[in-house]
């Protein structure tokens, strides 16, 4: 049975909806100092701040709690004004995962508890995708994290460094993430074919499930050279020999919000 208002479109690729027995918390990292679009967490979307829209969307999932983790009193106050729980964290965290590690400690989460990290600029995220990431991690004792991907259908996105690609092994674990075209279609490019290889490359979707114990351990893992080169913090996990399970989503991810033009496109959705 579906929760009222919740979308179950994202049961794709054989991953069942989250087991009601799987309890998980959604954490949303949010800060004002966005480099490409400053203050976007508080950008108005149909009368509500973006971060509040994200939290409301997350609340349609099966999460037992949705909490915003921020270093901004403005963001905390905006959340409180709309009934969204928010925690204040330190301002010196280098990544969103580091911020969420502090939030796990503040919340007193058990090491086995599942946490899903939803980015603070995803106001159109599918609630079913959140459930799928939590459910997949609960099923995969061989993995410390879960994430998601969607089959690319646009050749321009294949070559776009802002669209992160992922390749997986035979049992759905990430082998590598890259901003480069991945996998590289040698024969197609050698013959000048401007098309996508078959099977289609996978576009990474920036949602992550973790055990709270691993999330607390993440900041102690040394940064990897590949992480610095690609500017992708999930590569730190693979570098240290850990595994990430990948849910194949049937639903195309919502648009990213990195420029004023992106923001205007999303605003049209909210009228």
Curated annotation (Swiss-Prot):
**What CDD domains does the database record attribute to this sequence?**
CMP-KDO-Synthetase (cd02517)
A GO CC term? Answer: cytosol
Catalysed reaction equations from the record = 3-deoxy-alpha-D-manno-oct-2-ulosonate + CTP = CMP-3-deoxy-beta-D-manno-octulosonate + diphosphate
For whether the record's keyword set contains Transmembrane, the answer is: no
The EC category is: transferase
Q: Name one GO molecular function term.
A: 3-deoxy-manno-octulosonate cytidylyltransferase activity
Q: Which SUPFAM superfamilies does the record cross-reference, listed alphabetically?
A: Nucleotide-diphospho-sugar transferases
An annotated GO BP: CMP-keto-3-deoxy-D-manno-octulosonic acid biosynthetic process
Q: What is this protein called?
A: 3-deoxy-manno-octulosonate cytidylyltransferase
Protein's organism: Leptothrix cholodnii (strain ATCC 51168 / LMG 8142 / SP-6)
């Amino acid at each position: 049975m579906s929760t009222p208002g919740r979308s179950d479109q994202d049961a794709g690729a054989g991953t069942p909806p989250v087991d009601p027995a799987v309890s998980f918390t959604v954490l949303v990292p949010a800060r004002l100092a966005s480099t490409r679009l400053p203050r976007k967490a508080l950008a108005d979307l149909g009368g509500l701040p973006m971060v509040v829209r994200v939290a409301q969307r997350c609340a349609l999932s099966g999460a037992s709690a949705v909490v915003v983790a921020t270093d901004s009193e403005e963001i905390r106050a905006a959340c409180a004004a709309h009934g969204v729980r928010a925690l204040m964290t330190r301002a010196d965290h280098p990544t969103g995962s580091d911020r969420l590690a502090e939030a796990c400690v503040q919340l007193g989460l058990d090491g086995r508890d599942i946490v899903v990290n939803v980015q603070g600029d995803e106001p159109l995220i599918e609630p079913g995708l959140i459930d799928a990431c939590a459910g997949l991690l609960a099923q995969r004792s061989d993995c410390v994290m879960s994430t998601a991907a969607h089959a690319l259908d646009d050749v321009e996105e294949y070559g776009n460094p802002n669209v992160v690609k992922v390749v997986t092994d035979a049992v759905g674990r990430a082998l590598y993430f890259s901003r480069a075209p991945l996998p590289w279609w040698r024969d197609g490019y050698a013959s000048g074919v401007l098309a996508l290889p078959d099977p289609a490359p996978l576009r990474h979707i920036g949602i992550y499930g973790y055990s709270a114990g691993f999330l607390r351990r993440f900041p102690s893992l040394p940064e990897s050279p590949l992480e610095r080169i690609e500017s992708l913090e999930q590569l730190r996990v693979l570098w240290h020999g850990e595994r990430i399970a990948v849910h194949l989503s049937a639903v195309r991810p919502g648009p990213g919000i990195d420029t004023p033009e992106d923001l205007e496109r999303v605003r049209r959705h909210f009228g």
